[in-house]
Amino acid sequence: MEVCRLENRPLPHAAVEANLLRQVKESAAEGLFKSFQLLVGKDVRENSVRFEVLLGVYANVIEFVKFLETGLAASCINTEFRDLKRMVDGKIQFKVSVPTIAHSDGRRPNKQRQYIVMKCTSKHHISAEIELAIADLENMHMEPETDLDMLEYIGTVKTVTSALQFGIDALERGLIDTVLSVKLRHAPPLFILQSLSDPTLTERGLKKSIKSDLVSMFKDHLITHSFFINKAEALATPRQYILGMLSSIINSVSKETVFKGTSTYTTSSGEPVAGVIETTDAILNKLLTLLGEYKTEVVGPAAYASYVVRGENLVTAVSYGRAMRSFEQFKNKLVDDPVGQAGSLDKNADSDNEYSSLPQTTIPVSVVKVGSQPVIVESIQKMYNEAQAPFPLNRRMQYTYFFPLGLFIPRPKYTTSTSVKLEDDSCLSSEVWVVNKTNTPLCFNYQNALRTLCHPRVNSPSACLQELQRSNLADNALEAFRDGLRSRPMDNMNLFAHVRRFYLKRTEVVLLPIAQKCNLSTDDLLHPTNHKLLQLELHPLFDFVVERVAAEEAAFRATHRTFSGNIPQPLAPNQFQDSRGKQFEAATSLQHAVDDATLEVIRSTAFDPTYPFICYIVEAMIHGQPEKFTMNIPFISLCINTYWDNSGNLAFINSFFMVKNICTHMGGGLINRDAYALYRKILGEVVAIKHAIVRMCGAEQLGNNELQGYVNGLLDRQLLPPFAYRDTFAQLDNRGARFVIGAKEHDNSQAFVHALPDFENANQVAPAMYHTRNTFNWDTFEYITVSNGNNDADAADLEKIYYYVMLPVCTNGHMCGMGADFENIAIVLGYNIPVFDIPQFNGDDTVLEHLENGPLRDILIASEVNPTADMLRMMIVSYLNCPQMTQVVRVKTRRDHCQNLGPEQGAIIEHTVMVNGFVCFGIPERMKQVAKNMFYPVPFHRFYCDPLVAGSWDNHIQNYVMNNFSQRSLEAFNAPPGIMADYAEWHKAPMAKYITSCKASTASLSAFTVMHNKLSPIAFIVQAKHKIHPGFALTVLRTDEVLAENVMFSARASTSVFVGRPTVSRREVRADAVSFEVNHELATIETGLSYSSVVTPAHVASITTDMGIYCQNLFSIFSNEIYDHADVNNYVARKIGVEDAVNRHNPRALIAGVGQISHPPGLVHGQYATCEVIPTPVTADVAYFQKSNSPRGRASCVVSSDINNQERAEQFLYDHSLPDPAYEYRSTVNPWASQKGSLGDVLYGSRYRQVSSPGIYSPSKPFFNKEEMLKNNRSFYTLVNEYAQRLAGYAATSCTDLQYVVINGTDVFLEQPCLFLQEAFPTLSASHRVLLDEYMSFKNTHAPVHMGHYFIEEVAPVKRVFKIGNKVAS
């Protein structure tokens, strides 16, 4: 091969000018292209070998000069190591002396300790490719003879120059990128480093309590120190704040390295540079603008130091902070001066001169002064921008925010602000206002959440039951109940004997959980000691209970709560229901026909011990027959007027039939005008409530059914009035209802209804009636006797409103059902001389003048009523077609199609109708003896089973109540299982609890009416439209993504960079070109004695999501789950905007459950940040949402637990017998989400989300997926332990070879801290728009709670500047 003479200009070892680096580049390129002229040969491909050699030589000369010009090099010891290719990844030993303290108290001095610190080397390979065309290489060999040849030659030179420059620039950028990556790999986040470096923690060791402290400090530092540039912009003195932050950043890292005293970069005045801050262009400009430049250049080496290792054993050692140039020097050091005393400076002078002898040059960089330390500030973002590569200091970070919707704030005893004037001081909000990233106020209300709330998965208990059944039922067998879950048929038709036998044989009292909850406060229910009750509170729409199915076997059952009023009081208190009533009034423009004074008259009547007993007899004789009412108008008028004149109360107010007919037939002056006006008002109020409900529901049809029954239970045809005097059962014949009469069950009313004989034909039927009364065995006569009904739905609705709303509210539930023995009543009335001796006694004479002592006289005297003989005779005539006795019918119907999801047992709802029964109030003791032969109490409905009223009528019930203190309350009173089963009823204990404590006011009427609104999708839709609270609050969860610009600080001499020699290889890619691949090996060693680099997010470049109110659409996720009625599905889909004809005809969606998500045609504020809602009790503490907490309602970060003990970790998460570690006085703030098997758990936990479309994003999943939570907690646990091992105590004393690197998972912690902390940050939100306006005012303090509304400030790492209009939040 021909010898080539190459021109080479090595770097001089002498003083040079400041522009040396530029000269190196120019001289190298010039020499290279002159050498091209020496390439001769016949085959260009052969000559390319020489070009390869040539390229390698000159690449070696000019490579990595740009790196020395960067500020990043100031934090490194840069050394050329020609033998680097022979080195493999390994460990290098450094000997470090640990200083000690000489004590003055006589303690024995410590010996000098030296430790060998093991540092791991890391090798890196960078390469660049240079591709040259064959034609260009041929042109390089030609002798330019003409001008055209010269022009072509010059073009070739330019092409080769460009290719060479491209490759060399790539290598130079590669070195910078490699060093920056190495720095980042050794740079933990500031909030971790500061927390773990706290000496108060490291001195105490890493106990469980310390780890919990660390989590708290992580959160504090994360919120306080993140994005300090943004926070400084809102301050009056941003310079001081930024200097303080930079000082914290600089002081958080270790200044100690194995190269003690080494400083290769100084200012022009000789001050050593403390380190370098690497950041982005935007932050660099902001820092220089605020802080100013201290210096504009630094003095640094213009070349790499030479590093040579000789000898058989390749050992690199640093002793006493001085670098050993060779193994011989290291050996001499150990032999000649092992303790490093005399002459140590002379012996180390050689290593010092290694850096001092390098040529120096000035490098233009920006230097700021933080305290007394000069720090280089630079940005190399331009290099990445030019290469169109992502800048490592730009990161996408995700933060999860949460805010509450619909919380109820009890009326406070005081207020902290008076700036907002509201019409009512006890408002209830059904919306929440948030501010998106463009400072646009947005309203999130229940309409936004309908796509979740209306989904069948939310309205079904199946998933919750499945999880409960997986639990240990043996532990719950002792808590199981047999009574209260389902009714049992009566033995016969003798209602009196059935009730009497139940209370005589009752030896134990059953206090059902549904009743126990009613008598607890919110704090009591959520207390750990009540975890047995709390474990059954899993769902806002369902009651769960343990049923005993065998001697030692139990099973969990779920029944729908049906009405919003059936949510227990601790989770929906009475004051909250009153506020809902006001919303109902406002939405329906309800104008009450009565005033509170009128309702007080009803209440006074119910509690009046002198209520005329004769009124019960009159009511029994009429028993709901209009013709008998008209026959007995004189007697009725006498009772009304007498009682009104004596007490000012209203007679017959316990019967809607009587009230309605009084208003119809007695308006002509037959009774007192004032009394009649009150009757009319009462009836008018019932009509007004009916019209208000209709206005709320609207006039829409749901197929062939009216919509009202799906919204409010009072208009549901499945619910019958509690008292029947006519055939009201026929309307259910075609609705799948079943009727239990005695021990038999029928599916058609015609099978058990006997029509009452027509009163007009009494003469013809009287003998037959007399015969049946005296010959039938009425105990086994399983039929009821009522008059034919007219199926007037409107009249039935008014009757239900009166008995289910008006009477319970006005009487505070001081009522009971009452059965009658009609024959005994007729005997008491008729078997008296003035009554049946017509010739002797004039019909106009009052009976008390001629009446002998007996029950009737006692009754009339006690009632202060003195009727005429004709009045009593007409009353006796009414007995001709009276029924024989009072009966009950147990009505079982299927729930509406929105509430019948889940097990079949829960799809059945029951209630009892008393046939020819009445409502009774309490009676005085003196009347009990007389009354017991005619009437008897029947506790058949939760509103009509007051134990005190029942006990006043029956001694056996009275003894039962007196012997069992828990049975004195309406909601807990046990009733015979044949006529009432609490969990299967329409009206349950919470509604009974409300009526016992509410005021007799129009507000209570409205509240109790809206409490009959159903917990169903259609009801949610209607209430959301009218802004009526549905009965439960929501926790709204949203994850936002920000593009963060980070700041990295690296201390001086914290990394040793070794630059090897390049190798050039040829690789032919195609026939017309030759590629040369330049490979270069690098090595780095982290030299700090602790973490010497740190990174922290400093500035929000942009928020990529809209921070808006777009809510998750569960119908797209679980598209195969539907209701079992096409009209219901179509209505729900149409009203909430999920009607998609494609999905309905798509087999993939129906079979696999894969929905098709509809995407908007365009966006305005950025990518939608999907919100998900978690049902939450309205009594949840608003303070819980004012700081970072778990959206589950219970702390979920188990970093302080043992990761190897999964049982303990799960106990931390789900065991509510233990208090919430974050709030010791309660187990949870949201039992519907924090418990295993709760609605939130099954809705967002991946165990239950059998989704075939994995692309659906769920911000709630990380907080509910148990496996992911435990995995993140294990990672967090490992991360804390690993960092703590490196930072606890003096690191050099460790006998391990721990390296100061970023622990796996740190990037996730930095970019998604909410995953590890298991907490979400509160975002700016207010339950009323005006509170946002107040926040934007000049005030510095703002009331968090104001007149029933609440305001939550944003507490998050991202500090947003809120501006609405011209107002900026202070």
Swiss-Prot record:
HAMAP family, per database record: HSV_MCP (MF_04016)
Molecular functions (GO terms): structural molecule activity
Any Pfam family the entry gives: Herpes_MCP
Family listed: Belongs to the herpesviridae major capsid protein family.
Superkingdom in the source lineage: Viruses
Gene source species: Alcelaphine herpesvirus 1 (strain C500) (AlHV-1)
Record text on subunit structure and interactions: Homomultimer. Makes the hexons and eleven out of twelve pentons. Interacts with triplex proteins 1/TRX1 and 2/TRX2; adjacent capsomers are linked together in groups of three by triplexes, heterotrimeric complexes composed of one molecule of TRX1 and two molecules of TRX2. Interacts with scaffold protein; this interaction allows efficient MCP transport to the host nucleus. Interacts with capsid vertex component 2/CVC2. Interacts with the small capsomere-interacting protein/SCP.
InterPro entries: Herpes_MCP, Herpes_MCP_upper_sf
Name the record gives this protein: Major capsid protein
Localization of this protein: Virion; Host nucleus
Alphabetic keyword roster: Capsid protein, Host nucleus, T=16 icosahedral capsid protein, Virion
Free-text function comment from the UniProt entry: Self-assembles to form an icosahedral capsid with a T=16 symmetry, about 200 nm in diameter, and consisting of 150 hexons and 12 pentons (total of 162 capsomers). Hexons form the edges and faces of the capsid and are each composed of six MCP molecules. In contrast, one penton is found at each of the 12 vertices. Eleven of the pentons are MCP pentamers, while the last vertex is occupied by the portal complex.
Main location: virion
A GO cellular component entry from the record: T=16 icosahedral viral capsid
SUPFAM superfamilies from the UniProt entry: Major capsid protein VP5 (SSF103417)
Name of the coding gene: MCP
